[in-house]
């Protein structure tokens, strides 16, 4: 019986230490995607800066055919936002915000999906290259 108590206490202690250590683990993940577009930056940047344009061609929203999209003023640039929701599944929704916009240079998005407390931070940079644009 003593051995059983000892093993139980050790197990509870180890599980507690593991749970406590997981509080300090960074859950963020970062990755970089680079794409070269065959148009100048003054043609490419407005497609990312205006959320109505962005929602029409973005792969993220193209596979959400039956979703209800709502856009809020201003419709482009810093402060613009949109929300999306699946009318058939009320728990499938989210919001997209443009938090920073530097003309023809940088955009910073925040994407909230569902009930997740922390948003996705999406930084997009535009680099002009002759008559093309490199998007990172």
Question: Where in this protein do the model-derived segments appear?
Answer:
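A generic structural signal for beta-strand entry/edge sites
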Residues: 28, 79, 104-106, 130-134
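Aromatic-capped interface at the extracytoplasmic side
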Residues: 18-34
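Hydrophobic membrane-insertion alpha-helices, especially the h-region
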Residues: 5-22
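Beta-strand/loop substructures that line and gate deep hydrophobic ligand-binding cavities in soluble
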Residues: 3, 108-136
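Glycine-rich portal/gate segments that line the openings of hydrophobic small-molecule binding cavities
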Residues: 4-10, 36-38, 42, 53-56, ...
């Amino acid at each position: 019986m003593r051995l059983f108590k000892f093993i139980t206490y050790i197990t509870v202690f180890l599980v507690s230490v593991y749970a406590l250590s997981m509080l300090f683990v960074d859950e963020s993940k970062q990755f970089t995607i680079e794409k070269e577009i065959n148009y100048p930056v003054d043609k490419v940047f407005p497609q990312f800066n205006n959320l109505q344009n962005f929602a029409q061609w973005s792969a993220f929203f193209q596979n959400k055919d039956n979703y209800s999209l709502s856009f809020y003023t201003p419709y482009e640039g810093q402060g613009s936002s949109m929300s999306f929701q699946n009318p058939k599944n009320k728990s499938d929704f989210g919001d997209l915000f443009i938090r920073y916009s530097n003309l023809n240079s940088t955009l910073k998005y925040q994407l909230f999906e569902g009930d997740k407390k922390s948003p996705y931070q999406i930084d997009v940079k535009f680099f002009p290259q002759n008559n093309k644009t490199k998007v990172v």
